[in-house]
Structures are given as C-alpha cells and as structure tokens.
Amino acid sequence: MPKLVLLSSATLDEQLSRATPALIRWILLRSASHVYRDLVETEAFLRAQGDWVSTVFIKPGGLSLDVQRGHALSLTEEKSPLSYADLAAAMIEAATDPDGRWDMRNVGVISVNGPAKSPPGAPMCIFMGFVRHYFPFLHPYLPSTGPG
C-alpha cells in the first residue's frame, strides 16, 4: 500500500498540544487560520482514503532553523521548538517503520537533547498572521514573515 507522510501541526491535536496554554493555542489557531483550515480538510480527505493509501500525520509544535539535536516520535506529546533537521529525521523514521506503528496516527516529535533555539522572528510572524486573520484587507500592506 502506498504511504504518505503529511506535515501537519500539533496545534490541531488536543492531546499533543495539551501543554500549550489555551490562550496561546487560540492565538496560534487564528494566526495561521488558512493553513490550519487546509490541514484539517487535507487530513479528513486522507483519512477517508485509508483503504488504498496509508498516511502518517506528523504533528510537530514550533519549528526552528537550528542544529539537529536528536528526536523521538510520540503519540502523546510534542516538545517545541524543534529543528527542521530533527523534523526531517522524524518524518523519515515514521515513513520507514517496518511495523507501520505510525500509520494513520497523529505523531508528535520530541527533541530529546534539549529544545532547539527559539526562532527570533516567531512573535512577529504570529502577530502578523493574527492581524491578517482579523483584517485580511491589510495583507498587501503587511510585511512578509517566516523562518529566519
């Protein structure tokens, strides 16, 4: 059976994001509302296709441009921030698991040797996303933000 590995978000999973304060989660869900809506629809579609394609739903928390520190996969938690290198290694591990333990499951990723550095641009990125959610007409006038 074919297998997909979908990069999603722990923010969408009650279990994986239970350590995130409710207010922070509420802000995050609005700051990237269009992305999260797309992910919810994509996940629902892929879960409905489970009879012919298997999917692993990788759900990290916050991501950072940092060095690889080591990772672990989890069905119950995530630890943020996580480096992109650790995320990539986790996705490969989940995809190549010979027993299919992660198939059709929400999978968190833990940085096992301490968290990655907090991305310095994250607060501005979240704030700009929040503004775009409530005032979409301002989009052409707002700065682009992202990893860095």
Curated annotation (Swiss-Prot):
EC identifiers of the protein: 1.-.-.-
Disulfide topology: none
UniProt signal peptide: 1-19
Domain of life from the UniProt record: Eukaryota
Keywords, sorted A to Z: Monooxygenase, Oxidoreductase, Signal
The protein's annotated pathway: Secondary metabolite biosynthesis
GO molecular function terms noted in the UniProt entry: monooxygenase activity
Keyword Cell inner membrane belongs to the record: no
Protein family: Belongs to the avfA family.
Function (record text): Oxidoreductase; part of the gene cluster that mediates the biosynthesis of geodin, an intermediate in the biosynthesis of other natural products. The pathway begins with the synthesis of atrochrysone thioester by the polyketide synthase (PKS) gedC. The atrochrysone carboxyl ACP thioesterase gedB then breaks the thioester bond and releases the atrochrysone carboxylic acid from gedC. The atrochrysone carboxylic acid is then converted to atrochrysone which is further transformed into emodinanthrone.
Protein name per Swiss-Prot or TrEMBL: Oxidoreductase gedF
Organism: Aspergillus terreus (strain NIH 2624 / FGSC A1156)
